[in-house]
Swiss-Prot record:
Top-level taxonomic group: Eukaryota
Compartments where found: Secreted
Name of the protein this chain belongs to: Slit homolog 1 protein
SMART domains named among the record's database cross-references: CT, EGF, EGF_CA, LamG, LRR_BAC, LRR_SD22, LRR_TYP, LRRCT
GO cellular component assignments: extracellular region
General function of this protein: Functions as a ligand for sax-3 receptor during larval development. Acts via the sax-3/Robo receptor to direct ventral axon guidance and guidance at the midline during embryonic development.
Cystine crosslinks: 873-884, 878-894, 896-905, 912-923, 917-933, 935-944, 951-962, 956-971, 973-982, 989-1002, 996-1011, 1013-1022, 1029-1040, 1034-1049, 1051-1060, 1076-1086, 1081-1097, 1099-1108, 1259-1285, 1292-1302, 1297-1314, 1316-1325, 1332-1368, 1346-1382, 1357-1398, 1361-1400
GO biological process terms held by the UniProt record: axon midline choice point recognition; dorsal/ventral axon guidance; negative regulation of axon extension involved in axon guidance; neuron migration; regulation of sensory neuron axon guidance; sensory neuron axon guidance
Alphabetical list of Pfam families matching this protein: EGF, hEGF, Laminin_G_2, LRR_1, LRR_8, LRRCT, LRRNT
Domain CTCK: 1332-1406
Signal peptide positions on this chain: 1-16
Length: 1410
């Protein structure tokens, strides 16, 4: 005995803990380890065992036999089907058992017999159908029993009644029709939702219980019919009746249910469940069953081990269900089964172990399914099979190895399959020649030479392979059938040539053996998953150049690990996502030239590790901070072949100011956001379904290549035309049953392929004149069930393809303007005779289809209630002489006259405009420029700014910190406590208390915890990132930046490489001329004179002077930014130009106790003037200045008055009346522009000198004080500002670039430049550029009914030559002899004129030619 004891002590601790688990202080955690069975070597003294989130399928009798001390067992989220009746017999101290979210179908009797101390049992979300007393007996003090979301139709309650401690019983989502009241239970929670309750006398107890409970209003009756849908708690007892037969029929036991499952019938040893609406295979089947009939149900899946106890079963019929999945070993245990009927289902695939255990099977019917192949090993387990029907599937070929064990096969049905009768099916033809097993009349589909030939009549020598045909079906036993060469293309070797074939889409049937795919010179617009390029794993070269591609799905090239060359040049790409490149990409050559790409994300270049040649010339690359990723990549790959346009004017170094400057640039154009499916929606095969998803707005992230979009049954009230018109491939759009009010002009203008548009049952009141502009392909339009009164003819003028239109159930106003519609639908026969007139009364209820022209008259005025449907301004909503401007059918803007504000200009600007009173206090004007605040309860102070302290008598416990609220307080608890007063202690490692950081795993230990850290972290709470820079030395002065299990060397300017080992590149700027080298242009560009050694300076934005050394503008974008100038005189004028889109921000501040301040509030200038006469005087500008355009602001102080003028608007005056008559400060104060120092801002806000102390976000320029221009480089203090405004405002606001686009450019004096389209020039792109080009291409030459044998190089002249007097024409041609082939089979030689040179020539008139 002593020897044994010593041996136990010598066993290492790790030997008693399974390798997949973590064992800490009697707790064993094996969560998420993909375990398929309960691990061995679990310590015997374990108290808690966590096995959730694994793949365990069964619990054996001895799995927990040694764990007698176990108190908590977690087995949820596994695949458990089987539990032995002795599985838990040793767990005598078990208190909590969770078996939820498994696949348990049946509980053994007495399974919990020894678990007397069990208090919590969770069996929810399984497939249990019957729960009997014998299954539940054992526990004596059960408190919680969860049975939610099973298929329970019978529940015995004798054991449940005996549990006087039972507080929670959940039965939601089952199939219970009745449940007898448990006699002794005192439920705290009883959940009964979603059961088909039969509300008779037996449920009166339930009604009384629900009447007292709260939140149980979803418990409704299913039967009898007169009570269907009624909430049980509101019924009266007199309606809940029972007949005598029903009372006698009710039994308190599930014994009969165990014998024969509902709703089946059992006769002898046959179980008949035909046409019973079953959605799953019944579990409680009698063991003596020999035949089961389950045909014509709704079963979709056959789980593993579904029939394992039915050893006597000989026939099983599962035909005419909707089975899509047969799980592995589904029929295991059916050793005597000789007939299996599976025809008429939706089975697409069979696993190799699907029929394991069916050694006696003789007849197998798999006809009328959707099988595409037969895998290797599928029939290895059925050696006695004599009859196999695969009739009416989609099988193309069968490998010989698949049938090698079917030695007894005598009958095979293969008809109605698209068989490929090539060399890979010759083996079957040889067997059929010997045994004649194929008797169904199967025919060949491919190759073309054998199409429609009967399989049984073809000799084996006809089954041949030509060229690459042997590759097509070579791997049929792996369910892979390759494609033949597309009809539009030519295939030679492994090259597929589809160049210049006029293709609109990529052929979907490209063979996988292709190594080169050439698709140049077509009309392809999208590259999506439908093209199947992503499956061409052998592809090495892909040429998609010279197409119209605007969109590439992120996963289109995902699996092309062998792709070395990708050509996408000369397309219309605006974005190239890094998602297109796989992490393991071997791409070496990438051509993106001639697109519309503006920039690339840094992630893209992180993946482009093997690219040695890249071309992006001819794109719209932005020469600003967004080109940094490309510049950085170039520095690290300078030896590579690059074809990239230089950005001569953009300079960047790695200093802090440049980093901050570039950090603020917008990233939208460079983002890597892929084309995902919208939230809540489903996307499949370019069809997006968002029906009935409670959407309140048009969803984002809809794939650009979507063809069908379903948005019906939502709450959408507006269609964003910009987002919708990106979906240019859309053919069907369903917006019915929403809350749309109007259709605006050009809402669908880009949807040129849309054929069906359904907008029925909305709240449409208005169609704008161009509502359906662009819908030339529309055939079906439904506007039924709306509130439309007018149908403008112009809205329907583009509907040239319309065949059906529905406008019934609308409030149509049929005056003379509706006559056209009646005439139109009569001539086109497109309306079904449902639409009727509602107004005027003279034609009320008149069918439009049968109305006569004389009935449509304009004799009376249109009622205002109808006219305002499309123009709300007719109601004159704007006040105080404001001008109403209609912006859409249901929207308008009131342009207020100066001095008024509000949606309808109903309010006059006064001292209370800025809501100066805090905490919802009431503001009342006392006199011009002054106000009083009337506080709400709980506040006090001049501005009601002080909150009365409610923490004086707080009841916070356990170290909780009291936080004062309004008329209340809250307790901020320490980490381990919760509750209103921190009175409840939390358990560690729960959702509410997990101290482990950085994804560390929390393990509870006797009231405390331990953290198991993720790789890269350490510390008690995994709070410390392990320093990966410890042994790293960055070169050339670089500094190491620690990451998570990684590091980066932050290099000095010009250096690159992993360790900053790559020296700086050569200066890429053009060499300056001698004259410019001696210049000092400061913040500008030197322009040398061509005729002398002199030069001039072209200043950058924000600078002026002969040497560009005077700073005239300053940008504000950083927190705490400000400029400090010399003190302001008591009486003086300061003028500035402001550009901003912000609603708030400091403009200027001067003073201490006495002050003048100007700030933005709601986009207006708020001026506060105080010279010592309390209270301060307030004034707001009558106009807003935050529209992004430049505004000239002038502020003048003179004694008690302060004057404000914005642009050329009238001067506004505010007076601080009282004894003091001049603005005098205590000390020498600076004049602050754009913001305040932190201490000054806090003080100014505390004393209500300013409402908001944030710095301005925008630009201030051309500052003058008393008409003297200020050089901002001479400011006393300059903190966190920008030298110019290019990074803070949009200088393109309000700029019209005509035939081009405006881009911000810090190097331009005006801050912007117009980038003209290819055929235009000039400062604003309003001058057409003279240009005549020869455009070359390769195509067939056509003459009458003859075509050239080969494609030939030809050209056309295109361009603009300055007007009608000149034209772009060919001035040099050559002749070429070309061989032609004609439709009648003859050939000839034709002479073709090939253009060699194009230029502008005078236009020849017809008269001059004569």
């Amino acid at each position: 005995m002593l020897i044994c004891f010593i041996f136990i002590l010598l066993i290492p601790e790790s030997a008693t803990c399974p390798a997949e688990c973590v064992c800490v202080d009697r707790t064993v955690s094996c969560v998420g380890q993909q375990l398929t069975e309960v691990p061995q070597n679990i310590p015997n003294d374990t108290i808690r065992l966590d096995l959730q989130d694994n793949e365990i399928t069964k619990i054996g009798p001895n799995d927990f036999s040694s764990l007698m001390n176990l108190k908590a067992l977690q087995l949820m989220d596994n695949q458990i089907v089987t539990i032995h009746n002795q599985s838990f017999s040793s767990l005598v101290f078990l208190q909590k058992l969770r078996l939820s979210r498994n696949r348990i179908r049946h509980l053994p009797d007495n399974v919990f017999q020894n678990n007397l101390k069990l208090t919590h049992l969770d069996l929810s979300e399984n497939d249990i159908t019957v729960v009997s007393d014998a299954q539940l007996q054992g526990p004596e003090f059960l408190e919680v029993l969860n049975l939610d979301k099973n298929h329970i139709f019978c529940l015995e309650n004798n054991v449940i009644s005996s549990w006087v401690s039972l507080e929670v019983l959940t039965l939601n989502g089952n199939r219970l029709t009745t449940f007898e009241e448990p006699s002794n239970a005192r439920f705290r929670q009883l959940d009964l939702f979603n059961n088909p309750w039969n509300c008779d006398c037996r449920l009166r107890w339930m009604r009384k219980w629900l009447e007292k409970a709260e939140g149980q209003n979803k418990t409704v009756c299913a039967t009898p019919l007169n009570l269907q849908g009624s909430s049980i708690e509101i019924l009266q007892d007199k309606f809940m009746t029972c007949s005598g037969n029903r009372k006698r029929r009710y039994k308190k036991t599930c014994e009969t249910a165990e014998i024969c499952p509902l709703p089946c019938t059992c006769t002898g040893t046959t179980v008949d469940c035909r046409d019973s609406g079953l959605t799953y295979v019944p579990t409680n089947l009698p063991p003596s069953t020999t035949e089961i009939r389950l045909e014509q149900n709704q079963i979709s899946s056959i789980p593993s081990h579904s029939f394992k106890n039915l050893k006597n079963l000989t026939r099983l019929d599962l035909s005419k269900n909707i089975i899509t999945e047969i799980q592995p070993k589904a029929f295991l245990g059916l050793h005597n089964l000789h007939t299996l009927v599976l025809y008429g289902n939706n089975i697409t695939d069979l696993k190799s172990d699907t029929f394991e255990g069916l050694g006696s099977l003789q007849l197998l019917l798999l006809n009328a399914n959707q099988l595409t192949c037969i895998r290797r090993g599928t029939f290895d387990h059925v050696p006695k099979l004599s009859m196999l029907s695969l009739y009416d599937n989609d099988i193309k070929s069968i490998s010989e190895v698949t049938f090698q064990n079917l030695t007894s096969l005598s009958t095979l049905h293969l008809a109605k399959n698209p068989l490929i009768c090539d060399c890979n099916l010759q083996w079957l033809a040889q067997i059929n020649l010997q045994k004649n097993i194929e008797t169904s009349g199967a025919r060949c589909e491919q190759p073309k030479r054998l199409r429609k030939k009967k399989f049984a009549t073809l000799p084996p020598n006809k089954f041949k392979c030509k060229g690459s045909e042997s590759f097509v079906s070579m791997y049929a036993d792996s369910c892979f059938i390759d494609s033949i060469c597309p009809t539009q293309c030519d295939c030679y070797g492994t090259t597929v040539d589809c160049n210049k074939r006029g293709l609109n889409t990529i052929p979907t049937s490209i063979p996988r053996f292709a190594t080169q795919l050439l698709l140049s010179g077509n009309n392809i617009s999208t590259v999506d998953l439908n093209s199947n390029i992503h499956v061409l794993e052998n592809l090495e070269v892909l040429d998609l150049s010279n197409n119209h591609i605007t969109f590439i799905n992120d996963k289109s090239f995902e699996k092309l690990s062998k792709l070395r060359e990708l050509r996408l040049n000369d397309n219309k790409l605006h974005h190239f996502s890094s998602m297109v490149l796989d992490e393991q990409s071997n791409l070496e050559i990438l051509d993106l030239s001639g697109n519309n790409i503006q920039c690339f994300s840094s992630i893209f270049f992180n993946k482009a590790t093997r690219i040695r040649e890249i071309k992006v010339i001819g794109n719209d690359l932005l020469c600003d901070c967004r080109i940094l990723p490309l510049m950085s990549w170039l520095r690290s790959n300078s030896s590579h072949s690059i074809d990239i346009p230089p950005c001569q004017q953009f300079q960047y170094s790695d200093n802090e100011s440049d980093k901050q400057r570039c950090a603020a640039f917008p990233e939208e154009t460079c983002s890597d956001d892929s084309n995902l499916c919208p939230p809540k929606c489903s996307c499949l095969d370019r069809v997006v379904r968002c029906s009935n998803k409670n959407l309140t707005s048009f969803p984002s992230r809809i794939p650009f290549d979507t063809t069908e979009l379903y948005l019906d049954a939502n709450y959408i009230n507006e269609i964003p035309a910009h987002d919708l018109n990106r979906l240019y491939s859309l053919t069907k759009l369903d917006l019915s049953h929403n809350r749309l009010i109007s259709l605006e002009n050009n809402t669908f203008s880009n949807l040129t392929r849309l054929s069906t548009l359904i907008i029925s049952y909305n709240k449409l009141r208005c169609l704008q004149p161009l509502a359906f502009n662009g819908l030339n392909a529309l055939r079906i339009l439904s506007l039924h069930g709306n509130d439309i009164s007018f149908l403008p003819q112009s809205a329907f003028s583009n509907l040239t393809s319309i065949t059906h239109i529905a406008v019934g159930s609308n409030s149509l106003y049929c005056d003379c303007n509706m006559a056209w519609f009646s005439k139109w639908i009569k001539s086109k026969f497109i309306e079904a005779g449902i639409a009727r007139c509602e107004y005027p009364n003279t034609v009320s209820n008149q069918l439009l289809l049968t109305a006569q022209p004389y009935q449509f008259t304009c004799d009376s005025k249109v009622p205002t209630k109808l006219a305002t449907k499309c123009d709300l301004c007719l109601n004159s909503p704007c006040k105080n002489n404001a001008i109403c401007e209609t912006t859409s059918s249901r929207k308008y803007t009131c342009n207020c006259t100066p001095g008024f504000y509000g949606v309808h200009c109903e309010n006059q600007i006064d001292a209370c405009y800025g809501s100066p009173c805090l905490n919802n206090a009431t503001c009342k004007v006392a006199q011009a420029g002054r106000f009083n605040c009337y506080c709400n309860k709980g506040f006090e102070g001049d501005y009601c700014e002080k909150n009365i302290d409610d923490c004086v008598n707080s009841k916070c416990e356990n170290g909780g910190k009291c936080v004062d609220l309004i008329n209340s307080y809250r307790c901020d608890c320490p980490m381990e406590y919760e509750g209103k007063h921190c009175e409840d202690k939390l358990e560690y490692c729960t959702k509410k208390l997990n101290p482990c950081e950085n994804n560390g795993k929390c393990i509870p230990i006797n009231g405390s915890y331990s953290c198991m850290c993720s790789p890269g972290f350490t510390g008690n709470n995994c709070e410390t990132n392990i320093d990966d820079c410890k042994n790293v030395e960055c070169q050339n002065g670089g500094s190491c930046v620690d990451g998570i299990l990684s590091y980066d060397c932050l290099c000095r300017p010009g250096y690159a490489g992993q360790y900053c080992e790559i020296p700086p590149m050569m200066d890429m700027e053009y060499q300056k001329t001698d004259a410019c080298q001696q210049s000092a242009c400061g913040q500008g560009e030197c322009v040398a004179s061509q005729n002398s050694s002199d030069f001039t300076c072209k200043c950058h934005e924000g600078f002026s002077g002969p040497s560009c050394d005077r700073q005239m503008s300053v940008g504000f974008k950083n927190p705490g930014a400000y400029l400090a100038l010399d003190p302001l005189a008591s009486d003086g004028t300061i003028t500035m130009t402001l550009r901003t889109t912000s609603k708030i921000g400091i403009l200027l501040y001067y003073g201490d106790d006495h002050f003048v301040s100007a700030e933005l509030y709601d986009g207006r200038v708020k001026l506060v003037y105080y010279i010592g006469n309390f209270p301060a005087s307030h004034m707001y500008s009558s106009v807003k200045v935050n529209d992004g355009l430049p505004h000239r602001i002038s502020i003048r102080t003179s004694e008690r008055k302060c004057f404000l003028q914005i642009d050329k608007n009238p001067v506004q005056i505010v007076e601080n009346s009282g004894k003091s008559d001049q603005l005098i400060t205590k000390g020498k104060e600076m004049l602050y522009i754009g913001g305040l120092p932190i201490e000054k801002s806090q003080d100014a806000k505390r004393r209500f000198h300013v409402k908001n102390s944030e710095s301005l976000k925008g630009c201030i320029s051309s500052i003058t004080i008393n008409e003297v221009p200020i050089n901002l480089q001479q400011a006393l203090e300059n903190v966190n500002t920008e030298q110019s405004c290019s990074a803070t405002v949009n200088f393109c606001a309000g700029i019209d670039c005509g035939n081009g686009k405006c881009t911000n450019n810090a190097l331009s004096p005006k801050g912007y430049m117009c980038q003209c389209d290819s055929h235009f020039s000039g400062e604003h792109c309003d001058e057409k550029r003279i240009k005549c080009d020869k455009q070359k291409f390769r195509r067939h030459h056509i003459e009458n009914e003859c075509r050239s044998v080969d494609r030939i190089k030809i050209a056309e002249c295109n361009g603009y030559c300055g007007g009608e007097q000149n034209c772009c024409t060919a001035v040099k041609k050559k002749q070429r002899k070309v061989k032609m082939i004609c439709k009648n089979g003859t050939t000839k030689i034709s002479t073709v004129h090939i253009i060699r040179q194009c230029q502008c020539e005078p236009t020849k008139s017809v008269l001059s030619e004569k």
